[in-house]
Amino acid sequence: MKKVLQVFGEPLSNGGQESFIMNMYRNINRNNVQFDFFTPYYCDNEKLVDEINSLGGNVFEKKGNFDSKGNKKDFIKNLSEFLKEHKYEIIHIHSGSIFALAYGAKIARKSGAKKVIVHSHCGGFKNLKYRLIKILSTPYLLKYPTNYYACSKLAAEWKFPKKIIKEEKYNILKNAIDTNKLYFDENIREKTRKELNIEDKFVVGHIGRFSLQKNHDFLIDVFNEIQKKENNSVLMLIGVGELQGQIKEKIDRLGLKNKVLMLNLRSDIQELLNAMDVFVLPSFFEGLPVVGVESQATGLQVFTSTGVTRELPVEELAYYYPLEYSSEKWANNILKEYKGYKRKNTTELIKESGYDVKIAAKKMEELYLT
C-alpha cells in the first residue's frame, strides 16, 4: 500500500481543495493508496478531521500564523520540521500560492520523497507581484516536482512554467463529484427550506471561504441590488474565513442582517444546494471551482465572473459576467436568466462531461502507483 502525504498551503477548512481531495479519498481504493493530511497552519473543520480518521488517514497541523497574503516563514519552517520527523515516498502539494508549490516541492524532494506532485487549483491576480513570484519560483518548479496536476488548462498556465505547458508535461484532473450524492430532489428542497424557514423566499446561495479571492464584498453588493427588486430574497452564505467579520459588518451596515443566513461550516451541502434558487460566485479568480460543478449537479444556474475558467460542465447553466459590470447589472442579469427557468436533474450531463468521481479517482490512483 502506498501512503501519500497531502500538503496544503493554507489552513484546512471547507474549501475547494479540501472538497476535491476528499471526493478522491472517499472513492479511491484505500487498500492500494492511503492519505495523510498536513497544513503548516491550522484546521478549523472538525468534521473533516473525523472523516479523514474514519477513512484511515491522519491530520497534522502545526498551528502556524496565517493571513490572506500567506505566511512564507511559517510555511517553510513548519513543513521542513514536519518532514524531518515523518517520511513519505509520495507528497502531493495543493495551494493557491505559487510560492507554496515551488518551495513546498523543494522541501519535499530534500526530505527524500521520490514522487512530488504540485497541483494547481486556481488562477490569481495578474499583477507585478504575481509576475515577480512566478519568475523567482520557476527554477524550483522546473527542478523539484516530478509531476504537475491542474484542474484546468487555465489553472496549469497560471502556476506552471511555460516549458511545462509547452511540452504538455502536466495532467488535467477534473474536479469530479459523487453524482450519487449530489442531484436535484424536490423533496429534499422542500424539507430543507422548511427547516431554514425560507419556504417562500428567493434564495441566492454561495459557498466559499471568506477570503479576498472569493470577492464576498461584491457579492453583498449584488445581493443588495437583488433584494431591492425582489423583496422576498435571502442570501445564504456557507463557509468561514479571515474576512468573515469584515463581511458581517458590511451586511449590518447595509441593513441586511435579517436577509442573510450565515451558516458557517456545513456538511449537508446537497441539502443546502437543493434549497437554493441560484448560485452566485463572483470570484476574482478560480481554476475550475468544485462548488460550481456541485451546484450544477443539483440543477442550479451558476452565475460567476469571467475570472473563472469557462469549463463548467453544463454550459446552459453557466453564466459568466465581467467584474467591471456594476452590481446592479449583475442583479438584473441574474433575475432575468432565472425567470422562467425550470430546474431539472443534470446527473447524466455531469457524467457525460467526465466529472464522475469514480473515473477521476481511478485515474488519480494510477498516477500515484505508476
Protein language model regions, located:
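Nucleotide-activated donor-binding/catalytic signature segment of Leloir-type glycosyltransferases, i.e.
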Residues: 248-264
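N-terminal strand-loop element at the rim of the active site
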Residues: 6-77, 169, 242, 367
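Aromatic "clamp/platform" in nucleotide-sugar-dependent glycosyltransferases that forms part
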Residues: 265, 284
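A conserved mid-protein helix/loop that constitutes part of the nucleotide-sugar donor-binding site
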Residues: 15-23, 202, 206-225, 242-248
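A short helix/loop element that forms part of the nucleotide-sugar donor recognition site in Leloir-type
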Residues: 183-198
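A short, active-site helix/loop in glycosyltransferases that binds the activated sugar's phosphate group
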Residues: 144-184
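A charged, aromatic-enriched C-terminal amphipathic alpha-helix characteristic of glycosyltransferases
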Residues: 341-370
